[in-house]
């Protein structure tokens, strides 16, 4: 049974920026399920895509791994020999809780948990890279360099799975999808106070891009084959494949 997210249930006089501290880590599974539509579907599909695209003797990266849900999904599906997973998160409480969580599952696939800024991590010999609702927390000026480094570190035929909250350039559509997401949170038991306070806490730390911006960035990095494979309201996931003839 997960601890219920009540972080923003009472009025907070001095509301600071949202951060992945011990308090958030304690309620994160409940928070993510009640806040991100389609999250479980995305996690399941990450495992299936890893099974299809992982290459023998390669590395798989979970960048911004939080509690290791995507890491465990990949590990559970892998059958290729010699694969290693590197799971990275900047939050010390997240990494420690992920370590405890992953240790509860038996697997022959080794996982290296790394506490670091994903912008400082070398991507090498990769067949699968996952950015699952992570890029939106990266400094916008650093995003292109990160995507380029991922492309360069992927083997030909490797994939990037990029899940994000999207901003839409058509204003009426964007407004509608925002409202539908708020309805989703209300239906999951969040009060207007909780929704408002969390939105304000996230304002300075989570900056979303449009689908067009993501597509352009991926194209510029060298991903010729890329598109949206999942969407629910203003949340979704993209897949980008490095051509088998790419260097």
From Swiss-Prot:
Presence of the UniProt keyword Transferase in the record: yes
Gene: cmoA
UniProt xrefs under PANTHER family: CARBOXY-S-ADENOSYL-L-METHIONINE SYNTHASE (PTHR43861:SF2), TRANS-ACONITATE 2-METHYLTRANSFERASE-RELATED (PTHR43861)
Any GO molecular function: S-adenosyl-L-methionine binding
Quaternary context: Homodimer.
Binding-site positions, S-adenosyl-L-methionine: 39, 64-66, 117-118, 132, 199
GO biological process: tRNA wobble uridine modification
InterPro entries per the UniProt record, alphabetical: CmoA (IPR005271), Methyltransf_25 (IPR041698), SAM-dependent_MTases_sf (IPR029063)
Record Pfam families: Methyltransf_25
Keywords: S-adenosyl-L-methionine, Transferase
Record lineage: Bacteria, Pseudomonadati, Pseudomonadota, Gammaproteobacteria, Aeromonadales
Name this protein carries in UniProt: Carboxy-S-adenosyl-L-methionine synthase
Entry function: Catalyzes the conversion of S-adenosyl-L-methionine (SAM) to carboxy-S-adenosyl-L-methionine (Cx-SAM).
Catalysed reactions, semicolon-separated: prephenate + S-adenosyl-L-methionine = carboxy-S-adenosyl-L-methionine + 3-phenylpyruvate + H2O
Gene3D superfamilies documented for this protein: Vaccinia Virus protein VP39
CDD domains: AdoMet_MTases (cd02440)
Similarity section: Belongs to the class I-like SAM-binding methyltransferase superfamily. Cx-SAM synthase family.
Gene source species: Aeromonas salmonicida (strain A449)
EC number, as in UniProt: 2.1.3.-
Keyword Cell cycle: no
